[in-house]
Amino acid sequence: MADKGWKAAERRYARAVGTTRIPVTGERHGADYKTELFAYQLKIRKVIPAWLFEWLHGICSTAGKDQVGVLVLNRPRCRTGDALVVLRHSDWVDLHGEIEN
């Protein structure tokens, strides 16, 4: 039986950071893959707000040659520490990928 698309995606993204996919254990919010330092949960969606990609592209375009563009998102009156940090997967892999477990 062929893999579901999401399983193949989890394997592909896990390989990019030097690890393997964790099989589903029934935990609703469990990690899809882990490294020594990070626990990842991958979400592939048909619809993600276009403005998010536009804003990320904007900061990546203006970042210097040796800089990584990072988009920080938060809601009004929310704690600074709860903000989301978004960067391109390719930049993440450049920084943290190919890690041997």
Predicted regions located by residue number:
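Catalytic phosphate/metal-binding cores of nucleic-acid and nucleotide-processing enzymes, i.e., regions
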Residues: 1-101
